[in-house]
Amino acid sequence: MKSKAAVRRIVEELKVLYPNARCSLEYKKDYELLFAVRLSAQCTDARVNMVTPSLYQKFPTLEAFANATYEEVGDAIRSCGFYNTKSKDIVECAKILLEKYGGKVPGTMEELTARPGIGRKTANLILGDVYGQPAYVCDTHCIRITGRLGLTDGSKDPLSVEKQLRAILPPEESNDFCHRLVLFGRDRCTARKANCDSCPLRKDCDYGKAQK
């Protein structure tokens, strides 16, 4: 287990590297983030950001999504892949948000994960970015990098990683920390190469310290 001092150093160093941590998906309304995250499954954020402006122009309200057919939404998101499943989830989710929540995205883990196509990763992102709650978005970058750093035991299971991070991260730092790990994972600590020689986290990184 990392010392509190080591965890704090890692958190602070990432702040220096990425002071403006934010979700890379573009949105203006709470449900737009929810739908964008659904589209991002097996798709890049960059591609999603290319698709969503025209999607939200075609369906400018939650009611428009709820009244659309799966095929209509699917045609608008085709380039994001798996459009048949994603379009169904989006339309059904829009209906539920209107019928049960007055058109607002709910603000609890239990309510969010009960919706079609929403898992803990998406729910954490909504809780953190929309509601400002402590949130632990355990995507592939987070899982890989926290394992290399030694913040977790190296588990590849998102729920296990989330539980371990909840035990060591200051809650108020959690959401931005996970956003910064995404940027760090794209820029420096990639899946193919860790780039330890020039890494500012190396002194506190189990993987980095083991490299010669």
Where are these regions (language model features)?
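Catalytic cores of DNA base-excision repair glycosylases
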Residues: 2-212
